[in-house]
């Protein structure tokens, strides 16, 4: 496991997770990253409102999906957490969930129904909802971009055409890499905690593919964004798709400089 410190605690974690829910610790991000993610959430909220989507928010009752717990193979902890999340949603009368990232989309839409009997909540990514509404750009983009498709969105949830439709309608010119859509290449994120060296190697290879196509790279996943930004050359901007869409579709969004 290379030199990753987290592996020193796996044996302890296997025992502790039976009595303590560790999902919150696994999901925690750094303050700088958190500010970036918060801005992306504001972008998404503005986009949905501009498209006429009526939605609410559960605040403290908006629980983490448990995606990382699932990926780590902590089955008992994940199942208990999934039931907690589902019960919370049902107790608040939720019939449809709008997700903001690929991992949550996949866990709620494809995994929960397999482990929770009678799961009956509709789950859609905000990108799917926006693509259905086909909003008009109020401030068209004049930019050339390349898309890094999320492995989970593209291969498991069939979210491939929607982001392209939204970017094209926003005025962006898309330059596709050879490995795009369902043939997308990994950002290295799944390896980060156990094999940081290999993760950086994978991310660097992917970044080389992307930067050869365009100077602006569009991501749709916070893990992809973090890993690719870390290895991006100075002349390449790596930004979340919500940044571009908010600039084009939301009239009150200030145009921001490329976030490298």
Walk through the language-model features, giving the residues of each.
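Iron-sulfur cluster-binding electron-transfer modules in prokaryotic oxidoreductases
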Residues: 1-260
